[in-house]
Design a protein with these regions (language model features):
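ATP-dependent small-molecule kinase phosphotransfer cores
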Residues: 32-127
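Hydrophobic alpha-helical packing residues
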Residues: 25, 29-30
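P-loop (Walker A) phosphate-binding loop of NTP-binding proteins
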Residues: 13
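A glycine- and Lys/Arg-enriched "phosphate-lid" helix/loop adjacent to the NTP-binding pocket
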Residues: 104-170
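Hydrophobic positions on the alpha1 helix immediately C-terminal to the Walker A/P-loop
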Residues: 21
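Hydrophobic anchor at the beta1->P-loop junction of P-loop NTPases
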Residues: 10
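Conserved lysine of the Walker
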Residues: 18
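Phosphate-binding P-loop
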Residues: 1-5
């Protein structure tokens, strides 16, 4: 097995094709003999997945404060870094994340209006130097992304159910 200590992330709104591109990349890297760890954010570790459930729960729509949302995303990220990302990198694996800190800047910093300065301060504490060396942003028209998401046939989660204007700010 080939070793590498690389950490990459893909960013974009829901329906932009992140997961599809990540799966194709992982397939190609695995065929070349690399050990690859895939994770999604929020999630990827047991505690982080529980935090994800809270963040996406439609029962909290209109109840969860923007700062709570920001702190929960950072809590999930801190856990997945400690439990999954850093150990994988230390073991010479490639880590590919379906979203990472840039989503927090876009969603909470800009779309929620909390500001880049606050997000930056929390991100520095949360990540403690563990950042992707490359992030690819998949840009797609909001309406096209929403149409793709709707084709999945799943009920929209708390964030997916935001108005189009929210995603335009993202």
């Amino acid at each position: 097995m080939k070793t590498s200590k690389h950490f990459f992330s893909l960013e974009g709104i829901d329906g932009s094709g992140k997961t599809t591109q990540i799966d194709m990349l992982i397939d190609a890297l695995t065929k070349e003999g690399y050990s690859v760890v895939k994770l999604r954010e929020p999630g990827g570790a047991k505690i982080s997945e529980r935090v994800r459930e809270i963040l996406l729960d439609t029962n909290f729509k209109g109840i969860m404060s923007d700062k709570t949302e920001l702190l929960l995303y950072n809590a999930a990220r801190a856990q997945v870094i400690a439990e999954i990302i850093q150990p994988a990198l230390d073991a010479g694996k490639i880590v590919i994340a379906d979203r990472f800190a840039w989503s927090t800047f876009a969603y909470q910093g800009y779309a929620r209006g909390l500001g880049a300065d606050l997000v930056q301060r929390l991100t520095e504490i949360t990540c403690d130097g563990c950042f992707p060396e490359l992030t690819v942003v998949l840009d797609i028209d909001v309406q096209r992304g929403r149409a793709r998401t709707a084709k999945r046939g799943e009920a929209p989660d708390r964030l997916e159910s935001e108005k189009a204007e929210f995603f335009e700010r993202v």
